[in-house]
């Protein structure tokens, strides 16, 4: 049964579902009648004959009795019916997988549960071993199957002697060896299945359908919902039995289709997002490529900045030093072969000249030495020390210019007195 239907039935206070106004019991909820119970109990008390028991040699030379798996399944079908019992594997563990000289050794344990149609069950553990195979997959397959078969036989053994519990009685096994074995029955080849079509089953199914059509569907009966008790003021709200089963089936189908549809939508959405991301990355690459090309072309067109052997700042500092400390002052004096006297320098400084004459001479001095003030930096403001140095240089130059005519007259007088 599907999961949604089981959840619906569990939520309805464990009431069985209704089909055509009749309750339908699930597996594990059916009850044996008294006759069935007595017949099954009598059959399970019987002990198995030597025809059902096999033996093999175990480790250490000991003889071990067991029942083959297919015989146990046939016995369970005879006792409970083919649809009266079921088994399930609740847990399976791989204990070890060893590789030795190219051969695999595997051990697996499995827990198997056998349940009858009335809900009673037995559960036991089985173990399977595979040794010496060179294929790992085949070793695991053999060990798993052996573990499940062993667990199934041990679980069925708990129901009674007829399903294998009698082989644990060693006294019975000793006495069993005294019984002669019956000759196996000849196989009737006429009863073997040779065709795909089974006429007896088809005829029984057809008769069942015709019987249902002859009886007709029962009239829909108005019943209250089994999921909740109807209050007094809602007593007129009733549900139809036929609609219950159809709604449950439609609910299960809808849930399954919705889950499948959601998975498809998720996959489609993921593909769309991936495609959108790829397109965005491609557009970014295309947009970055032209920008880089334009930048490269622009860099190629622009001229390279001029490379000066002497930095501008160094040149300006050199000019400033030349302005503050003029080197051509002594060269001009040496060209005239004149040596300045201390008295000639001090005398003009001691004379008191009018302001107009000093201003005129200062202007002439500035004209004779034009490079002193023209090469100064306009941005730099000279400090007080710089102004004092410039004023001192101007006074020295002015006194020398004033003393030059006086020296010339003295030289002429000396030449006249000394004819040689």
Curated annotation (Swiss-Prot):
Pfam families: Rad52_Rad22 (PF04098). Belongs to the RAD52 family. NCBIfam families: rad52. Involved in double-stranded break repair. Plays a central role in genetic recombination and DNA repair by promoting the annealing of complementary single-stranded DNA and by stimulation of the RAD51 recombinase. This is DNA repair protein RAD52 homolog. One of its GO terms (molecular function) is DNA binding. Residues 357-368 have a biased composition (Polar residues). The modification Phosphoserine is found at residue 200. It is found in: Nucleus. Residues 222-291 are annotated as: Mediates interaction with RPA2. The modification Phosphotyrosine is found at residue 105. The lineage of its organism: Eukaryota, Metazoa, Chordata, Craniata, Vertebrata. The keyword DNA-binding applies. Keywords: DNA damage, DNA recombination, DNA repair, DNA-binding, Nucleus, Phosphoprotein.
């Amino acid at each position: 049964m599907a999961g949604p239907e089981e959840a619906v039935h569990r939520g309805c206070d464990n009431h069985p579902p209704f089909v055509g106004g009749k309750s339908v019991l699930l597996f594990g909820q059916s009850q044996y009648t008294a006759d069935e119970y007595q017949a099954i109990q009598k059959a399970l008390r019987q002990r198995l004959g030597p025809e059902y028991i096999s033996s093999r040699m175990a480790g250490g030379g000991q003889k071990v009795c067991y029942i083959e798996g297919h015989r146990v399944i046939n016995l369970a079908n005879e006792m409970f019916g083919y649809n009266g019992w079921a088994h399930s594997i609740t847990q399976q563990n791989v204990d070890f997988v060893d590789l030795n000289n190219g051969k695999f050794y595997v051990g697996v344990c499995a827990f198997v549960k056998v349940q009858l149609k009335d809900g009673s069950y037995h559960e036991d553990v089985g173990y399977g071993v595979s040794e010496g195979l060179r294929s790992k997959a085949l070793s695991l397959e053999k060990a798993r199957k052996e573990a499940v078969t062993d667990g199934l036989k041990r679980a069925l053994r708990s129901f009674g002697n007829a399903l294998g519990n009698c082989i644990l009685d060693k006294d019975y096994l000793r006495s069993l060896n005294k019984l002669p074995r019956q000759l196996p029955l000849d196989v009737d080849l006429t009863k073997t299945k040779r065709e795909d079509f089974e006429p007896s089953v088809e005829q029984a199914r057809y008769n069942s359908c015709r019987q249902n059509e002859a009886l007709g569907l029962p009239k829909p009966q108005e019943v209250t919902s089994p999921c909740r008790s109807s209050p007094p003021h809602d007593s007129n709200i009733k549900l139809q039995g036929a609609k219950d089963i159809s709604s449950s089936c439609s609910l299960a189908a809808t849930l399954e289709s919705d889950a499948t549809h959601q998975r498809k939508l998720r996959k489609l959405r993921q593909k769309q997002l991936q495609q959108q991301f790829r397109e965005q990355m491609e557009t970014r690459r295309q947009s970055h490529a032209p920008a880089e090309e334009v930048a490269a072309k622009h860099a190629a067109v622009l001229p390279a900045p001029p490379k000066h052997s002497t930095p501008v700042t160094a040149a300006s500092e050199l000019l400033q030093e030349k302005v503050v400390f003029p080197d051509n002052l002594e060269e001009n004096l040496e060209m005239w072969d004149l040596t300045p006297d201390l008295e000639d320098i001090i005398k003009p400084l001691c004379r008191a000249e009018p302001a107009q004459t000093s201003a005129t001479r200062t202007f002439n001095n500035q004209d004779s030495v034009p490079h002193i003030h023209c090469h100064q930096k306009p941005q730099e403001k000279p400090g007080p020390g710089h102004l004092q140095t410039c004023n001192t240089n101007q006074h020295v130059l002015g006194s020398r210019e004033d003393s030059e005519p006086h020296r010339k007259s003295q030289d002429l007088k000396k030449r006249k007195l000394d004819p040689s």
